[in-house]
Structure formats: C-alpha cells, structure tokens
Amino acid sequence: MSVCIRCIKTDIMKIFCVGRNYAEHAKELGNAIPDEPVIFMKPKSALLQSHTPFYYPEFTNELHYECELVLRVSKNGKYIQENFASKYYDAVTVGIDFTARDIQNELKEKGLPWEKAKAWDNSAVIGKWVMLSGVKNKKDINFCLYKNKELVQQGSSTLMINSFDNVVSYISNYFSVNIGDLVFTGTPAGVGECVVGDELEGFMEDDSMFLMDIK
C-alpha cells in the first residue's frame, strides 16, 4: 500500500475509543461479541505523542498494550449517515490504548465504569499521521505492534466488526464529532503485558508509526 506521510498539527478535542471491535480479541478476554459498537472516552490529558517518554503508572501491577488504528476527525458533524461518514475524517495512524488490566478486571466484576483503568494520563499513544488521500484502500489497512523487536499483535481494518464509517456514524448519534477529535477503532487479538524497559514500535504496512520505551 502506498501512503503519503505528512505532519498534521491540530488541537485534540475528544478521544473516542471502541471496545471489542475484533471478534478474536473479544474472545481472548472472555467477552461476548457486541451487537453494536462499545464506546468509551478518554480525556485530552490521556494523549501521548510518539517519541515522548512513557512512565509506568504506579497504581497498576498489570499494564497491557492494545494496538489500534486511530482516525483523526476533520469536520464537525452530528447524526452523520454512514454513507457520508468518510467525509468527516482525513487521516489515520497507529496508537496504543494502554490499559491497567488488573484495575479493569476489578471494575468489570463490580459493574463499574472503566475510566480508572483506561483514561489516565498518557494512556492514549498516537504515532505520526498518514493522510487517507494517500491510502489506496482504507478498508484493508494492515498494522502491527512489536515488543522488544518481536511481533506481538497484528490486525487489519478488514477484520473489524464495525468499519470506520460505521463507527463514526454511530458515535455521532450520541456525541457531536469535532475537528481534532480522535477515534481509536479497537484492538485485534494478542494484547499482553508490558513492563519497565520494554520497547514498543507500531507499524502501518511497512512504515514505523511510533517507537517508545517504557520507563
């Protein structure tokens, strides 16, 4: 796939995240495959740009990586029809939805929200942006994550339960989408633990999107 990489400067507004958007990932965590997108959010303070130091949070003993494709919203909208949704985002990258898995499991057992497990500072990593105008087929974007030079996760937009357009349309039924919003579109199977000293590198096709060390 040929891509055109360029820097995009924008103010981040909201960070939307989609859970259980790959069937195999839902199965590996023992979750049912949902009938509709599972949406949660992170605050702006969760954002961590590529090449910025990441420090292991002191409140968890089980930090997991979840590698995902991330969309950048380029147009304001509400109640967007799915067949027009592609007009509302213009760039894609690879990111990580860091999760304090031990805390998330405790919260899930109690039926409580996930914010303490997923929405803390620097829990939403993003790499460099790729303009979708340079992507030949956005329905077939391959991405992967390496931990310490070893492949640990790989996925493709073809394997998503809910497509980019479906996700953006669905979100807009409940929230306004605004220029600068981000959409983490879900993680494939292969999530796992990371520790201090690990190196994580995310790729889209053959291009490195981010490289980071856990300190």
Where do the protein language model's features map onto the residues?
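Switch II (G3) loop of P-loop NTPases
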Residues: T187
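Catalytic-core "active-site belt" of small-molecule-metabolizing enzymes
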Residues: M1-N178, L182, G190-K215
